[in-house]
Curated annotation (Swiss-Prot):
EC number(s) given by UniProt: 4.2.1.59
Lineage of producing organism: Bacteria, Pseudomonadati, Pseudomonadota, Gammaproteobacteria, Alteromonadales
Name used for this protein in its record: 3-hydroxyacyl-[acyl-carrier-protein] dehydratase FabZ
Top-level taxon in the UniProt lineage: Bacteria
Originating gene: fabZ
Family: Belongs to the thioester dehydratase family. FabZ subfamily.
Length: 152
C-alpha cells in the first residue's frame, strides 16, 4: 500500500502566503511533514518578468529570487507546523546564513525546494534549504523566519 502524500495546490498556497504575482514563487507543494520537511516546486518560464532585464540575451533567474522562493517554502512549512493560517499573523523572512549558489537557473528549469525545520523557539524558526534542478544542486542556505502579529 502506498503512503499518502500531503500536497498543496496553488489555491491553498495562496491561503497561507500573502505574496501575489509576480512575487508568488511557489507553484505547488509535492509533500510535507509538519515540523520536519516540505518539498515544493517552481516552474521557471521565459515569461517571468525578471527575465526582461536579467539578462535579455542570456536569461538567468536572480539568486535573490531563488532565496526568496526558498523563504516562501520555509514559510509554508512554518504555517503547516502551526497547523493553521491566521489573518492576524505572518511569518517574516528574518535572516539567512551560509547561502551558496552552484548552478544558474534558466527558462525551462523546474526548481525543487527541500526545506527542513531545525528548531523553533518563541516564534522564531530555523530551517535549512536546498534547491535543485534535475537533481543538481542550485542553492543551499540556512533561513530564519519570525512569526509576528499584524494589525489591521
Amino acid at each position: 500500500m502506498s503512503e499518502q502524500l500531503n500536497t498543496m495546490d496553488i489555491k491553498e498556497i495562496m491561503s497561507f502566503l500573502p505574496h501575489r504575482y509576480p512575487f508568488l514563487l511557489i507553484d505547488r507543494v509535492l509533500d510535507y511533514t509538519p515540523g520536519e520537511t516540505l518539498h515544493a516546486i517552481k516552474n521557471v518560464t521565459i515569461n517571468e518578468p525578471f527575465f526582461q532585464g536579467h539578462f535579455p540575451v542570456q536569461p538567468v533567474m536572480p539568486g535573490v529570487l531563488i532565496l526568496e522562493a526558498m523563504a516562501q517554502a520555509t514559510g509554508l512549512l512554518a504555517y503547516k507546523t502551526m497547523k493553521e493560517a491566521s489573518e492576524d499573523s505572518l511569518y517574516y523572512f528574518a535572516g539567512i546564513d551560509k547561502a551558496r549558489f552552484k548552478r544558474v537557473v534558466e527558462p525551462g528549469d523546474q526548481l525543487h525546494f527541500e526545506v527542513k525545520m531545525i528548531k523553533e523557539r518563541r516564534g522564531i524558526g530555523v530551517f535549512t534549504g536546498e534547491v535543485k534542478v534535475d537533481g543538481e544542486l542550485v542553492c543551499s542556505a540556512e533561513i530564519m523566519c519570525a512569526r509576528r502579529e499584524i494589525s489591521k
